């Protein structure tokens, strides 16, 4: 019953690891090559419709959300940290993102901090951000929604959660 799977496209990009977000002029700063995985949707026409950036430090959770999104015919880029997601978004290395789905609790920068940075950015503020968490903490959920999160999903994320979100965001 499984359709022919398309292998995710792997790319490597160079990003700045300097502590200043957005850079400035100059140069300087350390740079490193980082892997980015873009999983294509099954239908060619669907690929251009919806592109989701999935951010989670758990490789299992990244794989689950990517599989659910691909089964719904969306293109998915996965990254393992909010810091990496923000770098790629600010550098324009993940073009045409229609939605960001991020875990709340990650080392370094949390999903909540990513949400705040996205909403403060004139370039990125229109991108809907959805927060996911395995912890049902009402104050945390309220705080994320007040900061502009499109939704807050409890893990494990189900295909029906993704369908509901994507139909609202198109």
From Swiss-Prot:
PROSITE patterns tied to this protein: RESPONSE_REGULATORY
Question: Which residues belong to any copy of the Response regulatory domain?
Answer: 51-170
The record's section on SUPFAM superfamilies has: CheY-like (SSF52172)
Q: Which CDD domains does the entry link to?
A: REC_typeA_ARR
Specify the inducers: By cytokinin and salt stress.
Give me any GO biological process, just one.
cytokinin-activated signaling pathway
Description of post-translational modifications: Two-component system major event consists of a His-to-Asp phosphorelay between a sensor histidine kinase (HK) and a response regulator (RR). In plants, the His-to-Asp phosphorelay involves an additional intermediate named Histidine-containing phosphotransfer protein (HPt). This multistep phosphorelay consists of a His-Asp-His-Asp sequential transfer of a phosphate group between first a His and an Asp of the HK protein, followed by the transfer to a conserved His of the HPt protein and finally the transfer to an Asp in the receiver domain of the RR protein.
For this protein, the record's InterPro entries field holds:
ARR-like, CheY-like_superfamily, Sig_transdc_resp-reg_receiver
* Tissue expression notes: Expressed in mature leaves and flowers, and at low levels in roots and shoots.
Q: Keywords for this entry?
A: Cytokinin signaling pathway, Phosphoprotein, Transcription, Transcription regulation, Two-component regulatory system
- Which superkingdom, per the lineage? Eukaryota
Keyword Glycoprotein tagged = no
Record-linked SMART domains: REC (SM00448)
Q: Which residues carry this modification: 4-aspartylphosphate?
A: 103
Q: Give the family, as the similarity comment puts it.
A: Belongs to the ARR family. Type-A subfamily.
Instruction: Relate the protein's function as given in its record.
Output: Functions as a response regulator involved in His-to-Asp phosphorelay signal transduction system. Phosphorylation of the Asp residue in the receiver domain activates the ability of the protein to promote the transcription of target genes. Type-A response regulators seem to act as negative regulators of the cytokinin signaling.
Identify the PANTHER family for this entry.
Answer: TWO-COMPONENT RESPONSE REGULATOR, TWO-COMPONENT RESPONSE REGULATOR ORR6
Q: What is this protein called?
A: Two-component response regulator ORR6
The UniProt gene name for this protein comes to RR6
